Amino acid sequence: TSHDEYAGYTEDGVKNAEMLSRLLKKFQTASSLVPAPVFNQEKNTSSMGIIYFGSTDCSMQEALDMLQEQNLKIDAMRIRAFPFNLEVWEFIEDHDLLFIVEQNRDGQMRTLIMAEGGIIPDKLVSILCFDGQPITAEHITNKINAHLSGKPTPAIAAS
């Protein structure tokens, strides 16, 4: 069941398809109107990138400084809205490996990126924190360094 363009009840499959197509068009339009992501660099110069959002911002800035002190250059982008606009997809396309920093257990942003963009899972590495505490710069840098050294650590809590 569905509704028609006047919000009236309908079981007409053609009307349902029309309404879903209409919603898809709105969703595509919205992606050009939402706030653009914020980049930590003027131009992407690394094959690696970090995607983060929300309350991870302050810790992420500190982590980027720590990584730079280790001579590890990683481009970074803070997502501010969904649906993702073109700049998000361009950033993803420009990088061979992306770390997705999240404060949840399930890697929801990583899953959303894969589902919406058809991105292969191997390109996206989750950096998760879900111990009830704010994520720290040390946790982020430790997880990135562990992954790059070939010794990834379990994604349980902040370390």
Q: For each predicted feature, which ranges?
A:
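Flexible, low-complexity linker and terminal segments
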Residues: 1-159
